[in-house]
């Protein structure tokens, strides 16, 4: 993050790396395979993932996090940023290499979920269009640019703390679902035995 005077205020390192696009999976466990891949695949990237859910203070009221591109596909990344104080999420994405596909639309759909899960507004800025401002309720706060449409968007964003059950208790939500499915499985198994008698 750089301020208007050109001073570096902080740094965020991408956490959710794309296998073979940004990292070689399990390269620590299979160093021979990783070495072979590096030798035989041109332009293979191998970044180290970030470890901090960075939130930048813009002023007393606004704390911004900027998950990069596919970081938003990990609910834990955005949740960690918001739990670390972010009350605005700005996602920057390079989706041009997907061409004229549904990738950008899918990205916007995922961003709506991140806004709803964490009850924070989200700004999506992409180099291939579909950029949009999304409110904490998942609704558009601005028009949405078309695919590969250049333009400028403005919107009024309400920054205020809102409670999110998911953000605060995600582990319990997932644990509850696992318990529910376990109980349903046991019930189905028991009922199946009863009806066979």
Where does each model-flagged region fall?
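Enzyme catalytic cores with a strong preference for nitrogen-chemistry domains
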Residues: 1-197
